[in-house]
Amino acid sequence: MAKTASPGATPPGNGAEPLPDNYETALAELETLVARMEGGALSLEDSLAAYRRGAALVAFCQQQLEKVEQQVRVLDGATLKPAAATDGEDDDL
């Protein structure tokens, strides 16, 4: 028998929930999901939904880290290195 979703009963992790606004919020939600899954009290269906949500959160966190890494590369290449190559006038920074 085919399973149909009931209206208003959207399980977490099926793609319907929007991703968090920032890395810290996503990481906190991911940690909560992991704790719930490790607790062993979730049904198989809830575990699968939590896994899917967790996978989406991990992908989001990786994407955010890659963005920050790219920004650091830009800063390191264009701004930070030339500023560090001064004659020592601003050594107290």
From Swiss-Prot:
GO terms for cellular component: cytosol; exodeoxyribonuclease VII complex. GO terms for biological process: DNA catabolic process. Heterooligomer composed of large and small subunits. Pfam families: Exonuc_VII_S. The keyword Hydrolase applies. The keyword Nuclease applies. GO terms for molecular function: exodeoxyribonuclease VII activity. Belongs to the XseB family. Its EC number is 3.1.11.6. PANTHER family: EXODEOXYRIBONUCLEASE 7 SMALL SUBUNIT (PTHR34137:SF1). This is Exodeoxyribonuclease 7 small subunit. It comes from the Bacteria. Signal peptide: none annotated. It is found in: Cytoplasm. It catalyses: Exonucleolytic cleavage in either 5'- to 3'- or 3'- to 5'-direction to yield nucleoside 5'-phosphates.
